[in-house]
Amino acid sequence: MKKTLSLCLLALVGCQSNDAQMPQEIAVQSGGELPDNKQYANLHISEAVYDVEKEAAFLLLAEAQQQALIWQQYCGSEDLTEDSLKSAWHSTMLRWMALQGQERGPENALKESWNMQFWPDKKNTTGRKMSTLVKADKAWSANDLSQMSVTVQGLGSMEWLLYDKASPIHKDKIKACDSGLAISLNIADKSDNIADAWQANPWKTLDEKKWRTEYLNLLSNQLEYSMKKMSRPLAKVGKPRPYFAESWRSETSLSNLKANVEAMKALYIAHGFGLDKELRDRGRIQLADSIVEQFDLTLDTWPEESSMFAMLKSKEGYRNVLAQFNKLEHLKYLIHEEVAIELGVVVGFNATDGD
């Protein structure tokens, strides 16, 4: 898959019909039946959760490929504008949210996390490294970037190129393409590695007790990461740090976080065979309902404003962001305390490390 895409882009030929399949097509090609047709009751206890993660990986791949192809078209003709590039980047970013913050799963997928996105960026390392990169008189390749700092490889560097005032994209299209095409291809390559790593279920050998530990920690890790994306810019009351927000340049931090919450809810439900069903089967219907209701409340009251950076500039905006953080904190309590006690699970224990 990766070689086909790389050759396509480097040759600047129109191969969109071959490689830029719709997300569902790529998910089907990943192998097996679609989840709705599966009889999960007859499969390993982890299978439904595995399908959620595998689907997320292949949906990310589809968007990353599409982004690379749009960059190819942008650089090879006058048919597309920067708005098309921004839309493709944002779509890829939203798909990445479903896998962001993971500490459980295939090793080859987890090790690509920093390559996909460098965050938090406390010292604006991305800005400094990208400024140096685009000043070089060179058309970069994905291979070049893969040997360099993670700050110029992934989604954060693409955001800088598309939105930062110092980016050449505002006045020199050729210079922007010298790095943008390579970054897009590198993101597609890393996404391909992630999707490939999720081709096999990494949890099939776990017994029920170890699987419950792994599952709860998988969900917990992503929840804590999402909370960190809010707590860092919120900082101290009255003294926010808006530049610590994840996507402050594009002003899409809150859109990203909403996608995080939606992905966590999907992980919790897992096609009707996830943690929600486990709790109901144990007679903990009220607890299961409380978690679903907390997810729904969080999503239903999510701010319409996509920019945390903008909201933190006012007291009312700060209060609204803090209110959403508190909802996630309550969700954390339900999972870390109530669910963990019910399942006899220690949050933070890695079930794959052995007894």
Role assignments for model-derived ranges:
Residues 16-19:
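Bacterial signal peptide processing site
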Residues 1-7:
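Sec-dependent signal peptide recognition
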Residues 12-14:
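C-terminal motif of bacterial Sec signal peptides marking the signal peptidase cleavage site
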Residues 22-355:
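Mature extracytoplasmic or organellar-lumen-exposed domains after removal of signal/transit peptides
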